[in-house]
Amino acid sequence: MMGMNPRQMKKLMKQLGIKMEELEGVEEVVLRMKGKEIILKEPAVTVMVVQGEKTYQIIPGSEEVREVLEISEDDIKLVMEQAGVDYDTAKKALEEAKGDLAEAILKLTEG
């Protein structure tokens, strides 16, 4: 397909039943995994439809990786019971303590 101009390429793709569309205005794409997130900023996103199946091609402008702290409901309930606080307060204390139960409880019961 060397030397094929864009118009010929579009015509060939249409004959093969392939549709392509560039998504405009995409600010970021977030990939969530256990324990971390990858944020793709200002990506070029193309959607290709072949035989009814969609495929997304993402080319990021920049990338950021963030660690994600996962706090279980059981941990939140334990802090609530031990420190005598509500759900939101217990969750916030655990987040600030990076999931450390003892540190969260001590912080809430001291002072």
From Swiss-Prot:
Disulfide bonds: none annotated. The keyword Nuclease does not apply. GO terms for biological process: protein transport. The keyword Protein transport applies. Residues 3-72 form the NAC-A/B domain. Keywords: Protein transport, RNA-binding, Transport. Contacts the emerging nascent chain on the ribosome. This is Nascent polypeptide-associated complex protein. It comes from Thermococcus kodakarensis (strain ATCC BAA-918 / JCM 12380 / KOD1) (Pyrococcus kodakaraensis (strain KOD1)). The gene is nac.
